[in-house]
Amino acid sequence: MKNPRDIIIRPLITEKSMDLAQENKYTFIVDKNANKIEIKNAIEELFKVKVEKVNTIRVKGKMKRVGRFVGRTPEYKKAIVKLRAGDKIELFEGV
């Protein structure tokens, strides 16, 4: 089994994710190879909360140019985690 800290890379704090936090849904950037069950277990172990549902999205890298050089931003996977009513992740509070 993978270490939960290897699965959950970092929280994704944007205006849209803060609106979702009001609905008890929290957004994280996760390992590209992690599945929903691994993400659920990692969140429950790290934050001591109960997860009801996990939605995942693979975000493609965007094309970027610097002068004549063309490259891409990295691809990543994000997970939107819905918690049981009454549970909170304090990391997102007060941002």
From Swiss-Prot:
InterPro entries in UniProt: Nucleotide-bd_a/b_plait_sf, Ribosomal_uL23-like, Ribosomal_uL23/eL15/eS24_sf
Keyword Coiled coil: no
SUPFAM superfamilies: Ribosomal proteins S24e, L23 and L15e (SSF54189)
Keyword Oxidoreductase in annotation: no
Pfam families hit by this protein: Ribosomal_L23
GO biological process terms on file: translation
The entry's keywords: Ribonucleoprotein, Ribosomal protein, RNA-binding, rRNA-binding
One GO cellular component term noted in the UniProt record for this chain: ribosome
GO molecular function, one term: structural constituent of ribosome
Similarity-based family: Belongs to the universal ribosomal protein uL23 family.
Subunit field text: Part of the 50S ribosomal subunit. Contacts protein L29, and trigger factor when it is bound to the ribosome.
Function recorded in the entry: One of the early assembly proteins it binds 23S rRNA. One of the proteins that surrounds the polypeptide exit tunnel on the outside of the ribosome. Forms the main docking site for trigger factor binding to the ribosome.
HAMAP family according to UniProt: Ribosomal_uL23_B (MF_01369_B)
Name assigned to this protein: Large ribosomal subunit protein uL23
Species for this entry: Carboxydothermus hydrogenoformans (strain ATCC BAA-161 / DSM 6008 / Z-2901)
Gene name of this polypeptide: rplW
